[in-house]
Amino acid sequence: MEQRGWTLQCTAFAFFCVWCALSSVKAKRQFVNEWAAEIPGGQEAASAIAEELGYDLLGQIGSLENHYLFKHKSHPRRSRRSALHITKRLSDDDRVTWAEQQYEKERSKRSVQKDSALDLFNDPMWNQQWYLQDTRMTAALPKLDLHVIPVWEKGITGKGVVITVLDDGLEWNHTDIYANYDPEASYDFNDNDHDPFPRYDLTNENKHGTRCAGEIAMQANNHKCGVGVAYNSKVGGIRMLDGIVTDAIEASSIGFNPGHVDIYSASWGPNDDGKTVEGPGRLAQKAFEYGVKQGRQGKGSIFVWASGNGGRQGDNCDCDGYTDSIYTISISSASQQGLSPWYAEKCSSTLATSYSSGDYTDQRITSADLHNDCTETHTGTSASAPLAAGIFALALEANPNLTWRDMQHLVVWTSEYDPLASNPGWKKNGAGLMVNSRFGFGLLNAKALVDLADPRTWRNVPEKKECVVKDNNFEPRALKANGEVIVEIPTRACEGQENAIKSLEHVQFEATIEYSRRGDLHVTLTSAVGTSTVLLAERERDTSPNGFKNWDFMSVHTWGENPVGTWTLKITDMSGRMQNEGRIVNWKLILHGTSSQPEHMKQPRVYTSYNTVQNDRRGVEKMVNVVEKRPTQKSLNGNLLVPKNSSSSNVEGRRDEQVQGTPSKAMLRLLQSAFSKNALSKQSPKKSPSAKLSIPYESFYEALEKLNKPSKLEGSEDSLYSDYVDVFYNTKPYKHRDDRLLQALMDILNEEN
């Protein structure tokens, strides 16, 4: 009897422990005394319901018609448990379509977590804005900036365009911001008033929004800080991160004054901890949809989102529903070395890249700071998104009739892979577009984007269509460790119907997947023409047993392809954790695109060197002229070099001129020492018997040609750097293409010796 009592006690204790563990998961969520409800009867019906059921009506939620926020008169301000009985009573009312109690959402600002210049402006930090203007004199070196100066030279500086920064507030009286501040684009949803001024504290925690706004709209030529990308645009601030964040607050922020605001810039999202899967709530999702349909007088609001800083945590931005949305332009980062920085995340939804911080020795981003100060240490994808927003403001000034989808097409068609080509993971899709999970379609090129957007030649893209592909007879498929599930998906892309698609934009794979360890899943989707895309990579920190429920994995990697044919979905678990198990419950493939090919895509995309268009003191040179000059490029010592692809007769004719027509050893060594102070000490070249000994021009061009070819690495996928293998960034000794070129030349010198 005594033994039986002891057994019962142990069982009860074990049950209690399990109950506590399950409760602790829910306890993380803090519910607030706010209810959101959709009430088709409008304000009058909402007021009546509030009076009858004991609520205070707080008002309409943002720009969402028939959506209202209520506060219960007798409920506590916060609670660990949801008030299901109150929610049920509200949702059971025949006048209410749905109701939901609001809860706190964890949102992280996407700055990095701690673990002689053009004489155009008198702003003291202009010379440090390397990403806006290239300070180097030599035209042969690759560009480092975003090509904004040629746009400014046309008189396009963001005039008439309104951008609002959704963040922790805006120090609107800052000397470098005040002249461009727009109160109609500003609100404080944390304190519910019209002043977005940030809360000061000892740590300057709330500097984030002011820094992001400064990147966009710092004044030019006012002897303060630096220069904004769109320095004549108007900027506002939405204070919404310095307090409790709910779905209603996010929706109100995303949908704030959409008839006035053109561009919304957001550098935040769910925690970048490598284990969170979260996206917009019901209200925020509706705010996005309302914005693209009704914003900017029907042309659609432009939503710019930072792709995330969870790289060190092994995070994947496909698990972030904000960057993974078809309505946002997701922006990643590149360092001044032209590399993917340590904090950047990889995913198939990233559309493009702008510059930001990299290694600790790299330069960072300059902007305004709290207390009317300046900073040169803004970092992370937080700093990349506002630069992109500023570039889009330049495009909207040039062509105010651009739609939200026009802007995405412009980004896809003009972003450049050449300055980032030394990174692994580049692939050409079925439409001839270069794309990468780290960088999207490449580095933003302001001049190319604005030129293509010219209202005299640009044609708005055709109406958006949506085609849903699913198998109504699909039976759940089991998946275990070291196993895989392959699903063949044939489709005619709604051919013969009004929503037929011939040219793809976004692709969404919506799935419910039950699995014992979510982070061990790997999902790839291969298009009908063979473009393979990683929709989900493994996340070591994600030990959740919750899987995915109706989660949309979004990809832009098949942009421009014809979707007709058989697609292949592959879900695997190669973790080796034999206890893992689960199943694929259901899925559907959602194709977004157009029934006819957009005008600008009727000719293939032509990629040229990013240096083709100069935008600094070297002057602006027409692309066609540069192309014509290529067969007679000058060598480093001023003489002519014959390109490798010249005819054999021309090559033979110059054999006798090699000594005078190719770089000398002395010149190349001098060149290297100019770029690497330690080069001579690390690598002492042998004495040359002849100062006139030169490198054959064939070898010189071989060195150049090798720059864009990824090296092989043992153990990597297919003996090449895989799109999702980070070892490249840990093993490459030369971080910039300049250094790699110089090293290649020095290798040739050593071989000659």
Curated annotation (Swiss-Prot):
Its EC number is 3.4.21.93. Its main location: cytoplasm. The active site is at residues 167, 208, 382. It catalyses: Release of protein hormones, neuropeptides and renin from their precursors, generally by hydrolysis of -Lys-Arg-|- bonds. Glycans are attached at residues 401, 645. Residues 28-110 form a propeptide. The keyword Calcium applies. It is an enzyme of class 3 (hydrolase). Involved in the processing of hormone and other protein precursors at sites comprised of pairs of basic amino acid residues. Substrates include POMC, renin, enkephalin, dynorphin, somatostatin, insulin and AGRP. This is Neuroendocrine convertase 1. It comes from Mus cookii (Cook's mouse).
